[in-house]
């Protein structure tokens, strides 16, 4: 286990050595990984750091406004790039290709911002499980295997690449980051794109965004899952009134885990599952069916793609 009191000064010193001069930008998503990296980098290089938040259009409901509020003290720059990401994802159905499309667009947007502020370095919140899954061929991550082969940065700096998620949280508490950040549930780098099986469209995004909001609202505080979310699997036949309806199938996922390397599905009470189904199908008319995924990791991964 990490000892934050030893890790923090070493990480700050390492960043200082890797970025001796010039400016750096960081992909600040508001998740615990990027938030810890931003705080470490700020302590290491001060105002030579420019935190940037990219609104990909693949974010959770209300995400951008929350992040702007929480990090307003850090001179956060927000880039609205939804059109670029949806254009890159148009027609893409393969999960790996989707991740790489998001990763490449992600980097290109950052390169544009880096040129604008003359930044030489990119700081990223890659953690150890990301590297293991990418190197093992399980799935690429937008900040590991999903990166394009040619980048316009002098160097990519990854201050927490040897830490597990629970260790990152310990460091976050030691850095005195807000509780909302320290205990924030993991959210995939490619965002809602990997919670949509098949091509990403505006309609699917609308459905999965609202379904995720309902699932988090119902399960987070009551059951404290390590991760919980909804995914759009495809379409199925349902009934609305007396009429056949062809609508979306939404899968609900809720797991317990220590570090994300293994996970078990939560045994949610039947009445909770029925309530989730009722809310999702009534509040999102385009949904015809709701299912609950009980598969552990392994054999499944936590996310569907």
From Swiss-Prot:
Pfam families, alphabetized: GMP_synt_C (PF00958), NAD_synthase (PF02540)
Reaction catalysed by this enzyme: XMP + L-glutamine + ATP + H2O = GMP + L-glutamate + AMP + diphosphate + 2 H(+)
Leader sequence residues: none
BP terms from Gene Ontology: GMP biosynthetic process
GO terms for MF: ATP binding; GMP synthase activity
GMPS ATP-PPase domain: residues covered: 2-184
Keywords tagged on the record: ATP-binding, GMP biosynthesis, Ligase, Nucleotide-binding, Purine biosynthesis
SUPFAM superfamilies: Adenine nucleotide alpha hydrolases-like (SSF52402), GMP synthetase C-terminal dimerisation domain (SSF54810)
The UniProt record lists the keyword ATP-binding: yes
Residue stretches spanning the membrane: none
GO cellular component, one term: cytosol
InterPro entries according to UniProt: GMP_synth_C (IPR001674), GMP_synthase_B (IPR026598), GMPS_ATP_PPase_dom (IPR025777), NAD/GMP_synthase (IPR022310), Rossmann-like_a/b/a_fold (IPR014729)
Pathway in which this enzyme or protein is active: Purine metabolism; GMP biosynthesis; GMP from XMP (L-Gln route): step 1/1
Summary of subunit composition and partner proteins: Heterodimer composed of a glutamine amidotransferase subunit (A) and a GMP-binding subunit (B).
Protein name: GMP synthase [glutamine-hydrolyzing] subunit B
UniProt organism field: Methanosarcina acetivorans (strain ATCC 35395 / DSM 2834 / JCM 12185 / C2A)
């Amino acid at each position: 286990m990490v000892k934050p009191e030893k890790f923090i000064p070493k990480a700050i010193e390492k960043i200082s050595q890797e970025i001796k001069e010039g400016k750096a930008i960081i992909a600040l998503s508001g998740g615990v990984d990027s938030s810890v990296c931003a705080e470490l980098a700020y302590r290491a290089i001060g105002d030579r750091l420019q935190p940037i938040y990219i609104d990909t259009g693949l974010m959770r409901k209300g995400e951008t406004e929350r992040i702007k509020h929480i990090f307003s003290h850090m001179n956060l720059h927000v880039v609205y790039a939804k059109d670029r990401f949806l254009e890159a994802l148009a027609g893409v159905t393969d999960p790996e290709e989707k991740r790489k499309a998001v990763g490449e667009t992600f980097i290109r947007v950052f390169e544009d911002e880096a040129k604008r502020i003359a930044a030489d370095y990119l700081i990223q919140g890659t953690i150890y499980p990301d590297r293991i899954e990418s190197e093992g061929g399980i799935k690429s991550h937008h900040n590991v295997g999903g990166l394009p082969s040619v980048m316009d940065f002098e160097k990519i700096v990854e201050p927490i690449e040897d830490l597990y998620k629970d260790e990152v949280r310990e460091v976050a508490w030691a850095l005195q980051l807000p509780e909302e950040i320290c205990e924030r549930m993991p959210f995939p780098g490619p965002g809602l794109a990997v919670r949509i099986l098949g091509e990403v469209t505006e309609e699917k995004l609308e459905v999965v965004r609202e379904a995720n909001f309902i699932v988090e609202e119902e399960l987070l505080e009551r059951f404290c899952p390590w991760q919980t979310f909804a995914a759009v699997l495809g379409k199925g036949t349902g009934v609305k009134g007396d009429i056949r309806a062809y609508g979306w199938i939404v899968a609900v996922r809720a797991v317990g885990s220590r570090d994300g390397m293994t996970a078990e599905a939560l045994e949610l009470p039947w009445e909770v599952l029925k309530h989730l189904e009722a809310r999702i199908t009534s509040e999102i008319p385009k949904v015809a069916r709701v299912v609950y995924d009980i598969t552990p990791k392994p054999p499944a991964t936590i996310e569907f793609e």
